[in-house]
Amino acid sequence: MISACLINEDDSLSIIQITPKEPLPSDVIWLDVNQPDDEERQWLETLFVEDVPEEDEMDDIESSSRFRVGPDGVHIFSLFPQRLSNETRGVNMSFTMRKNLLISFREDDISIVRLLRYYIRHNKVEIRSALDILLKLQDLKVDQLS
């Protein structure tokens, strides 16, 4: 599933679902890719010079693979806490940051992403750029860990 966060002319935000048959709207600042199917992966390949991140790449724990700059932008792999009953486990997310487009990839549902999407839908967060989205996700992660 691919969700897109768009910044509107009045600086409000909207979240919509994107299908591979549609062109990418020009006002998208965040593409959130959750468990993409083959058709979605093929569509995403058209947006990248490099390969779209695979689940095994996101699970690589080498510190040298957590951050790099490539032809598609800045690539960041980050571990997010996910609470399941009384347990907390780490779930990896991959981010590609471009000039004003953040593309996130995940293979699991992550409560912090759900929380940010809730804040966006209910205008409870001030976001003006793709970088703001990335920073807010990291901020929410720190809040949850503390």
Give each language-model segment a name.
Residues M1-S146:
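Peripheral, non-transmembrane regulatory/ligand-interaction domains of membrane transport proteins
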